[in-house]
C-alpha cells in the first residue's frame, strides 16, 4: 500500500480493541535503492531500537496495567514499521484483556516479526523501573564556531577530511530532520565512532545541520549518514547511533556498524528522552 492511500498523516480514530492490521509496513529496499545500498549485501549490521512509553492493557479482572517497552528490529529486516501506525497499534491494546505481561510481550513481538519479516526481539518493563540518564560518548562538536547556510537537502559535499589516520568518537545534539509522512520534526543526538581518515569536525557539523529541513524516516537518515561517511573516507571501522526524542510516545534509535560483532551503546536515556 503506498503512503498516499494509507491513514498516515491523516486524522485517525483510535481503535478500542486489539487490531494487528493497524501496523503499516514500509519496504526498506525503496529508500536503500535511493542511497545505492544493495539490500542483498548490506554494508552494515545493526538494529533499530524502538522505545515505547505509552503501553497499556487490561488484566483478567479488567484493571489497567501500564508499562514501557523496548523492541529491536534488525537492520536486515525486509520492512520497517511506520511509527504512527505502531502508536495506533499499541493503543489498540488499551481495552484488551491480556493474561499476563509476558503474553502481551509475546503478541507484540510476534506481530512485529510478521510485519517486518524478521526476528524482532524486545522486552516490556513495569512502569516503576529505575532509569538513569547518561550522556553521549565521545567528543561533542556542537560548540564549533561555524557559518551555516544549507538547510534544504543533506549535502555530502560538505564532508571534508584530513589525510591522517585516526580512531575517534564524536557526537552532536544538532541533528534534526522531519518525518516523511507528517512533516513533524525529529530531533536526534548522533554518536559516530570510526577508524580512518580524520573527519574535519567543522565541515562535518555543517553536513549534519544540512539535514535540518530534510523529509526522511529516521532509519533512512541514519543510513544516509553512514553511507556518506563511508563513501567519503572509506574507514576501516564505522559505527553510528542516533537517539531520537520521543514523538507520539515512541522514540526510534537506529544503530549501524561495519562490525558484525557490534555491541549496542549504553541503554541509558539522554536528557531529551
UniProtKB/Swiss-Prot annotation:
Gene3D superfamilies: 3.30.1130.10. It is found in: Cytoplasm. NADPH binds at residues 83-84, 247-248. GO terms for biological process: queuosine biosynthetic process; tRNA modification. The active site is at 179 (thioimide intermediate), 186 (proton donor). Pathway: tRNA modification; tRNA-queuosine biosynthesis. GO terms for molecular function: preQ1 synthase activity. Keywords: Cytoplasm, NADP, Oxidoreductase, Queuosine biosynthesis. It is an enzyme of class 1 (oxidoreductase). Its EC number is 1.7.1.13. Substrate binds at residues 81-83, 218-219. It catalyses: 7-aminomethyl-7-carbaguanine + 2 NADP(+) = 7-cyano-7-deazaguanine + 2 NADPH + 3 H(+). One of its GO terms (cellular component) is cytoplasm. InterPro entries: GTP-CH-I_C/QueF (IPR043133), NADPH_dep_7-cyano-7-deazaG_red (IPR050084), QueF (IPR029500), QueF_N (IPR029139), QueF_type2 (IPR016428). Homodimer. Catalyzes the NADPH-dependent reduction of 7-cyano-7-deazaguanine (preQ0) to 7-aminomethyl-7-deazaguanine (preQ1). Belongs to the GTP cyclohydrolase I family. QueF type 2 subfamily. HAMAP family: QueF_type2 (MF_00817). PANTHER family: NADPH-DEPENDENT 7-CYANO-7-DEAZAGUANINE REDUCTASE. This is NADPH-dependent 7-cyano-7-deazaguanine reductase. It comes from Rickettsia massiliae (strain Mtu5). The lineage of its organism: Bacteria, Pseudomonadati, Pseudomonadota, Alphaproteobacteria, Rickettsiales.
